Amino acid sequence: MKKMNLLVGLFCIAGLSSCQKEKSKPNIIYILMDDMGYGDLQCYGQQKIETPNIDRLRNNGIKLTQHYTGSPVSAPARCVLLTGLHSGHAQIRANDEIASRGAINSHDSMYVHPELEGQYPLKSGTMTIGRMMQNAGYTTGCFGKWGLGYPGSEGVPGKQGFDQFYGYNCQRQAHTYYPPFLWKNDQRVYLDNKIRDPHLTKLDEGADPYDEASYRKFTQNEYANDLIFDEMIHFVDQNKEQPFFLLWTTPLPHVSLQAPERWVNYYVDKFGDEEPYTGNKGYMPCRYPHATYAAMISYFDEQVGKLVDKLKQEGLYENTLIIFTSDNGPTFNGGSDSPWFNSGGLFKSEYGWGKCF
Protein backbone atom coordinates (compact mmCIF):
# COMPACT_ATOMS: atom_id res chain seq x y z
CA MET A 1 0.00 0.00 0.00
CA LYS A 2 3.00 2.35 -0.08
CA LYS A 3 2.16 3.20 -3.66
CA MET A 4 -1.41 4.02 -2.71
CA ASN A 5 -0.39 6.17 0.24
CA LEU A 6 2.12 8.02 -1.92
CA LEU A 7 -0.53 8.71 -4.56
CA VAL A 8 -3.05 9.95 -2.03
CA GLY A 9 -0.38 12.08 -0.40
CA LEU A 10 0.56 13.67 -3.70
CA PHE A 11 -3.08 14.43 -4.47
CA CYS A 12 -3.44 16.11 -1.08
CA ILE A 13 -0.33 18.22 -1.58
CA ALA A 14 -1.06 19.14 -5.17
CA GLY A 15 -4.80 19.62 -5.10
CA LEU A 16 -6.20 20.02 -1.61
CA SER A 17 -4.28 22.90 -0.05
CA SER A 18 -6.57 25.15 1.96
CA CYS A 19 -4.97 28.20 0.36
CA GLN A 20 -6.26 27.22 -3.07
CA LYS A 21 -9.41 28.68 -4.50
CA GLU A 22 -12.34 26.28 -4.48
CA LYS A 23 -12.64 26.25 -8.27
CA SER A 24 -9.00 25.18 -8.69
CA LYS A 25 -9.44 22.00 -6.68
CA PRO A 26 -9.76 18.98 -8.97
CA ASN A 27 -12.74 16.70 -8.67
CA ILE A 28 -11.58 13.19 -7.79
CA ILE A 29 -13.30 9.99 -8.93
CA TYR A 30 -12.02 6.69 -7.57
CA ILE A 31 -13.43 3.66 -9.40
CA LEU A 32 -13.11 0.35 -7.55
CA MET A 33 -14.22 -2.84 -9.30
CA ASP A 34 -14.93 -6.07 -7.43
CA ASP A 35 -13.00 -9.29 -8.18
CA MET A 36 -11.81 -8.08 -11.57
CA GLY A 37 -8.45 -9.54 -12.57
CA TYR A 38 -5.35 -7.68 -13.67
CA GLY A 39 -5.72 -9.24 -17.12
CA ASP A 40 -9.44 -8.52 -17.61
CA LEU A 41 -8.87 -5.23 -19.44
CA GLN A 42 -7.66 -4.90 -23.02
CA CYS A 43 -5.02 -2.38 -21.96
CA TYR A 44 -3.57 -5.06 -19.66
CA GLY A 45 -3.54 -7.76 -22.34
CA GLN A 46 -7.13 -9.06 -22.43
CA GLN A 47 -7.95 -10.68 -25.79
CA LYS A 48 -11.63 -11.59 -25.40
CA ILE A 49 -13.36 -8.84 -23.41
CA GLU A 50 -13.78 -5.40 -24.96
CA THR A 51 -13.11 -2.37 -22.74
CA PRO A 52 -12.60 0.61 -25.09
CA ASN A 53 -13.64 3.34 -22.64
CA ILE A 54 -11.41 2.20 -19.80
CA ASP A 55 -8.58 1.68 -22.30
CA ARG A 56 -9.06 5.27 -23.46
CA LEU A 57 -8.57 6.50 -19.90
CA ARG A 58 -5.38 4.47 -19.67
CA ASN A 59 -4.10 5.74 -23.02
CA ASN A 60 -4.62 9.33 -21.90
CA GLY A 61 -3.29 8.74 -18.41
CA ILE A 62 -0.84 6.64 -16.41
CA LYS A 63 -0.79 2.85 -16.25
CA LEU A 64 -0.06 1.66 -12.71
CA THR A 65 1.76 -1.69 -12.79
CA GLN A 66 2.67 -1.87 -9.09
CA HIS A 67 -0.55 -0.62 -7.51
CA TYR A 68 -1.27 -3.49 -5.15
CA THR A 69 -4.31 -4.32 -3.09
CA GLY A 70 -4.03 -4.40 0.69
CA SER A 71 -5.83 -7.74 1.04
CA PRO A 72 -6.98 -10.64 -1.18
CA VAL A 73 -10.64 -10.38 -0.10
CA SER A 74 -13.26 -7.67 -0.17
CA ALA A 75 -13.96 -6.06 3.22
CA PRO A 76 -10.35 -5.89 4.47
CA ALA A 77 -9.16 -4.62 1.07
CA ARG A 78 -11.73 -1.83 1.27
CA CYS A 79 -10.76 -1.07 4.86
CA VAL A 80 -7.10 -0.74 3.87
CA LEU A 81 -8.02 1.47 0.92
CA LEU A 82 -10.28 3.81 2.89
CA THR A 83 -7.97 4.16 5.90
CA GLY A 84 -4.52 3.88 4.30
CA LEU A 85 -3.49 1.45 7.04
CA HIS A 86 -1.45 -1.70 6.44
CA SER A 87 -3.58 -4.83 6.75
CA GLY A 88 -1.75 -5.66 9.99
CA HIS A 89 -3.10 -2.45 11.52
CA ALA A 90 -6.49 -2.39 9.80
CA GLN A 91 -9.63 -2.76 11.89
CA ILE A 92 -11.18 -5.27 9.47
CA ARG A 93 -8.98 -8.20 8.45
CA ALA A 94 -11.36 -10.78 7.01
CA ASN A 95 -14.80 -11.22 5.48
CA ASP A 96 -16.12 -12.26 8.87
CA GLU A 97 -19.81 -12.14 9.72
CA ILE A 98 -21.41 -11.38 13.09
CA ALA A 99 -23.25 -14.66 13.51
CA SER A 100 -24.35 -13.84 17.07
CA ARG A 101 -26.99 -11.46 15.66
CA GLY A 102 -29.15 -14.34 14.42
CA ALA A 103 -30.06 -15.78 11.00
CA ILE A 104 -27.64 -13.57 9.08
CA ASN A 105 -27.44 -15.92 6.10
CA SER A 106 -31.19 -15.94 5.54
CA HIS A 107 -32.17 -13.40 2.89
CA ASP A 108 -35.80 -13.70 3.99
CA SER A 109 -34.81 -12.79 7.55
CA MET A 110 -32.60 -9.90 6.42
CA TYR A 111 -35.50 -8.50 4.44
CA VAL A 112 -37.62 -8.30 7.60
CA HIS A 113 -34.81 -7.43 10.03
CA PRO A 114 -32.29 -4.85 8.75
CA GLU A 115 -30.14 -5.44 11.82
CA LEU A 116 -29.14 -8.81 10.32
CA GLU A 117 -27.52 -7.10 7.35
CA GLY A 118 -23.94 -5.99 7.01
CA GLN A 119 -20.49 -6.76 8.31
CA TYR A 120 -18.18 -5.64 11.13
CA PRO A 121 -18.14 -1.83 11.33
CA LEU A 122 -15.33 0.67 11.16
CA LYS A 123 -14.96 2.40 14.51
CA SER A 124 -16.32 5.84 15.28
CA GLY A 125 -13.86 8.60 14.41
CA THR A 126 -11.82 6.52 11.97
CA MET A 127 -9.87 8.74 9.59
CA THR A 128 -11.03 7.60 6.16
CA ILE A 129 -10.26 9.06 2.77
CA GLY A 130 -13.86 10.29 2.73
CA ARG A 131 -13.40 12.24 5.95
CA MET A 132 -10.04 13.56 4.75
CA MET A 133 -11.69 14.87 1.59
CA GLN A 134 -14.50 16.47 3.60
CA ASN A 135 -11.89 18.25 5.71
CA ALA A 136 -10.34 19.54 2.48
CA GLY A 137 -13.63 21.11 1.42
CA TYR A 138 -15.00 18.36 -0.83
CA THR A 139 -18.53 17.02 -1.05
CA THR A 140 -18.22 13.24 -0.87
CA GLY A 141 -20.29 10.41 -2.29
CA CYS A 142 -20.00 6.63 -2.31
CA PHE A 143 -21.96 4.54 -4.80
CA GLY A 144 -21.95 0.75 -5.01
CA LYS A 145 -20.98 -1.80 -2.36
CA TRP A 146 -20.02 -0.85 1.20
CA GLY A 147 -19.46 -3.85 3.52
CA LEU A 148 -17.77 -1.85 6.30
CA GLY A 149 -20.56 -1.54 8.83
CA TYR A 150 -24.11 -2.84 9.28
CA PRO A 151 -27.14 -0.49 9.26
CA GLY A 152 -27.30 1.63 12.38
CA SER A 153 -23.66 1.08 13.31
CA GLU A 154 -20.83 3.62 13.46
CA GLY A 155 -19.45 2.07 10.29
CA VAL A 156 -22.11 3.21 7.81
CA PRO A 157 -20.93 5.56 5.03
CA GLY A 158 -22.66 8.62 6.51
CA LYS A 159 -20.58 8.27 9.69
CA GLN A 160 -17.34 7.51 7.86
CA GLY A 161 -16.88 10.59 5.74
CA PHE A 162 -19.47 10.32 2.98
CA ASP A 163 -22.18 12.92 2.51
CA GLN A 164 -24.17 10.66 0.18
CA PHE A 165 -24.41 6.92 -0.30
CA TYR A 166 -26.44 4.71 -2.60
CA GLY A 167 -26.03 0.98 -3.04
CA TYR A 168 -25.56 -2.21 -1.04
CA ASN A 169 -24.76 -1.95 2.64
CA CYS A 170 -24.20 -5.70 2.97
CA GLN A 171 -21.75 -7.80 0.97
CA ARG A 172 -24.04 -10.84 1.10
CA GLN A 173 -26.85 -8.85 -0.52
CA ALA A 174 -24.44 -7.84 -3.29
CA HIS A 175 -24.17 -11.46 -4.45
CA THR A 176 -27.24 -10.83 -6.59
CA TYR A 177 -27.73 -7.93 -9.01
CA TYR A 178 -31.50 -8.13 -8.58
CA PRO A 179 -31.83 -7.45 -4.84
CA PRO A 180 -35.17 -6.66 -3.17
CA PHE A 181 -33.74 -3.37 -1.85
CA LEU A 182 -30.75 -1.04 -1.80
CA TRP A 183 -29.80 1.73 0.62
CA LYS A 184 -29.91 5.49 0.10
CA ASN A 185 -27.99 6.99 2.99
CA ASP A 186 -29.69 5.49 6.07
CA GLN A 187 -32.95 4.52 4.36
CA ARG A 188 -33.86 1.34 2.51
CA VAL A 189 -35.09 1.76 -1.05
CA TYR A 190 -37.31 -1.19 -2.01
CA LEU A 191 -37.08 -2.49 -5.57
CA ASP A 192 -39.42 -4.39 -7.84
CA ASN A 193 -37.52 -7.65 -7.35
CA LYS A 194 -38.36 -10.82 -5.45
CA ILE A 195 -36.12 -12.26 -2.76
CA ARG A 196 -33.75 -14.73 -4.43
CA ASP A 197 -31.04 -16.15 -2.19
CA PRO A 198 -28.01 -16.31 -4.52
CA HIS A 199 -26.63 -19.30 -2.64
CA LEU A 200 -29.83 -21.34 -2.47
CA THR A 201 -31.69 -20.51 -5.70
CA LYS A 202 -31.04 -23.33 -8.17
CA LEU A 203 -32.49 -24.64 -11.39
CA ASP A 204 -35.92 -26.17 -10.99
CA GLU A 205 -35.95 -29.93 -10.65
CA GLY A 206 -36.03 -31.52 -14.08
CA ALA A 207 -35.19 -28.26 -15.88
CA ASP A 208 -33.13 -28.56 -19.05
CA PRO A 209 -29.78 -26.83 -18.33
CA TYR A 210 -29.32 -26.09 -22.06
CA ASP A 211 -32.68 -24.30 -22.38
CA GLU A 212 -32.52 -20.53 -21.83
CA ALA A 213 -36.05 -20.65 -20.42
CA SER A 214 -34.74 -22.60 -17.42
CA TYR A 215 -32.83 -19.50 -16.29
CA ARG A 216 -35.55 -16.87 -16.58
CA LYS A 217 -36.20 -16.65 -12.85
CA PHE A 218 -32.64 -15.40 -12.29
CA THR A 219 -33.38 -12.19 -14.22
CA GLN A 220 -35.81 -9.74 -12.61
CA ASN A 221 -37.09 -6.21 -13.12
CA GLU A 222 -34.56 -3.79 -11.64
CA TYR A 223 -30.83 -4.28 -12.23
CA ALA A 224 -29.01 -2.71 -9.30
CA ASN A 225 -26.10 -1.38 -11.33
CA ASP A 226 -28.42 0.72 -13.50
CA LEU A 227 -29.91 2.34 -10.39
CA ILE A 228 -26.53 2.93 -8.76
CA PHE A 229 -25.24 4.61 -11.91
CA ASP A 230 -28.27 6.89 -12.17
CA GLU A 231 -27.84 8.03 -8.55
CA MET A 232 -24.16 8.66 -9.15
CA ILE A 233 -24.86 10.84 -12.19
CA HIS A 234 -27.39 12.75 -10.08
CA PHE A 235 -24.63 13.34 -7.52
CA VAL A 236 -22.43 14.84 -10.25
CA ASP A 237 -25.32 17.07 -11.33
CA GLN A 238 -25.91 18.25 -7.78
CA ASN A 239 -22.27 19.06 -7.11
CA LYS A 240 -20.88 20.28 -10.43
CA GLU A 241 -20.39 23.81 -9.07
CA GLN A 242 -18.15 22.67 -6.21
CA PRO A 243 -15.28 20.16 -5.80
CA PHE A 244 -16.45 16.60 -5.20
CA PHE A 245 -14.92 13.25 -4.32
CA LEU A 246 -16.79 10.30 -5.81
CA LEU A 247 -16.00 6.73 -4.72
CA TRP A 248 -17.60 4.31 -7.20
CA THR A 249 -17.40 0.87 -5.58
CA THR A 250 -19.22 -1.17 -8.18
CA PRO A 251 -19.96 -4.81 -7.25
CA LEU A 252 -19.12 -5.83 -10.85
CA PRO A 253 -17.94 -8.37 -11.98
CA HIS A 254 -18.30 -10.31 -8.71
CA VAL A 255 -20.52 -13.38 -9.09
CA SER A 256 -23.42 -14.17 -9.37
CA LEU A 257 -23.12 -14.00 -13.15
CA GLN A 258 -25.89 -11.58 -14.19
CA ALA A 259 -25.72 -8.97 -16.94
CA PRO A 260 -28.05 -7.04 -19.27
CA GLU A 261 -29.37 -9.28 -22.03
CA ARG A 262 -28.08 -7.13 -24.89
CA TRP A 263 -24.50 -7.50 -23.68
CA VAL A 264 -24.87 -11.23 -23.02
CA ASN A 265 -26.23 -11.71 -26.54
CA TYR A 266 -23.30 -9.74 -27.94
CA TYR A 267 -20.81 -12.16 -26.42
CA VAL A 268 -22.85 -15.27 -27.21
CA ASP A 269 -22.58 -14.19 -30.84
CA LYS A 270 -18.87 -13.61 -30.39
CA PHE A 271 -17.95 -16.73 -28.40
CA GLY A 272 -20.57 -19.16 -29.68
CA ASP A 273 -22.47 -21.71 -27.61
CA GLU A 274 -20.93 -22.98 -24.37
CA GLU A 275 -21.54 -25.30 -21.47
CA PRO A 276 -23.96 -23.84 -18.90
CA TYR A 277 -23.01 -23.22 -15.29
CA THR A 278 -25.53 -25.09 -13.16
CA GLY A 279 -24.50 -23.79 -9.75
CA ASN A 280 -22.16 -26.55 -8.61
CA LYS A 281 -19.54 -24.04 -7.38
CA GLY A 282 -21.89 -21.71 -5.55
CA TYR A 283 -23.98 -18.69 -6.53
CA MET A 284 -26.71 -18.64 -9.17
CA PRO A 285 -26.73 -20.78 -12.32
CA CYS A 286 -26.04 -19.14 -15.67
CA ARG A 287 -26.74 -20.40 -19.20
CA TYR A 288 -23.75 -18.64 -20.79
CA PRO A 289 -21.08 -18.12 -18.10
CA HIS A 290 -18.23 -16.92 -20.34
CA ALA A 291 -20.48 -14.56 -22.27
CA THR A 292 -22.06 -13.22 -19.08
CA TYR A 293 -18.76 -12.56 -17.32
CA ALA A 294 -17.51 -10.66 -20.36
CA ALA A 295 -20.85 -8.85 -20.58
CA MET A 296 -20.58 -7.64 -16.99
CA ILE A 297 -17.21 -6.02 -17.66
CA SER A 298 -18.18 -4.50 -21.02
CA TYR A 299 -21.43 -3.20 -19.52
CA PHE A 300 -19.40 -1.46 -16.82
CA ASP A 301 -16.95 -0.15 -19.40
CA GLU A 302 -19.95 1.38 -21.17
CA GLN A 303 -20.95 3.09 -17.92
CA VAL A 304 -17.45 4.49 -17.51
CA GLY A 305 -17.78 5.96 -21.00
CA LYS A 306 -21.10 7.56 -20.08
CA LEU A 307 -19.59 9.06 -16.93
CA VAL A 308 -16.72 10.56 -18.94
CA ASP A 309 -19.23 11.95 -21.46
CA LYS A 310 -21.16 13.54 -18.58
CA LEU A 311 -18.02 15.16 -17.21
CA LYS A 312 -17.18 16.57 -20.64
CA GLN A 313 -20.75 17.79 -21.16
CA GLU A 314 -20.63 19.71 -17.87
CA GLY A 315 -17.15 21.10 -18.52
CA LEU A 316 -15.68 19.10 -15.62
CA TYR A 317 -13.49 16.57 -17.39
CA GLU A 318 -10.28 18.63 -17.61
CA ASN A 319 -10.44 19.33 -13.88
CA THR A 320 -11.24 15.79 -12.77
CA LEU A 321 -8.76 13.14 -11.63
CA ILE A 322 -9.99 9.59 -12.37
CA ILE A 323 -8.36 6.57 -10.72
CA PHE A 324 -9.38 3.07 -11.77
CA THR A 325 -8.56 -0.19 -10.00
CA SER A 326 -9.99 -3.40 -8.49
CA ASP A 327 -10.33 -4.46 -4.85
CA ASN A 328 -8.43 -7.69 -5.54
CA GLY A 329 -7.90 -10.20 -8.32
CA PRO A 330 -10.26 -12.66 -10.02
CA THR A 331 -12.34 -15.24 -8.23
CA PHE A 332 -12.58 -18.96 -8.98
CA ASN A 333 -16.18 -19.85 -8.17
CA GLY A 334 -19.73 -19.06 -9.21
CA GLY A 335 -19.16 -20.07 -12.83
CA SER A 336 -16.31 -17.64 -13.45
CA ASP A 337 -13.42 -19.04 -15.47
CA SER A 338 -10.26 -17.04 -14.83
CA PRO A 339 -7.94 -19.35 -16.82
CA TRP A 340 -10.15 -19.10 -19.93
CA PHE A 341 -9.93 -15.30 -19.86
CA ASN A 342 -6.35 -15.19 -18.53
CA SER A 343 -7.78 -12.89 -15.87
CA GLY A 344 -4.75 -13.19 -13.60
CA GLY A 345 -2.49 -11.75 -16.27
CA LEU A 346 1.07 -11.48 -15.00
CA PHE A 347 0.11 -12.96 -11.65
CA LYS A 348 -0.52 -16.51 -12.84
CA SER A 349 1.58 -19.19 -11.14
CA GLU A 350 1.63 -22.95 -10.65
CA TYR A 351 -0.11 -22.34 -7.33
CA GLY A 352 -3.08 -20.53 -8.79
CA TRP A 353 -4.19 -17.02 -9.72
CA GLY A 354 -2.92 -14.05 -7.78
CA LYS A 355 -5.74 -12.00 -6.28
CA CYS A 356 -4.18 -8.60 -6.79
CA PHE A 357 -4.42 -5.72 -9.21
Regions found by a protein language model. Give the residues of each.
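Formylglycine-dependent sulfatase
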Residues: K2-L7, F11, C19-F357
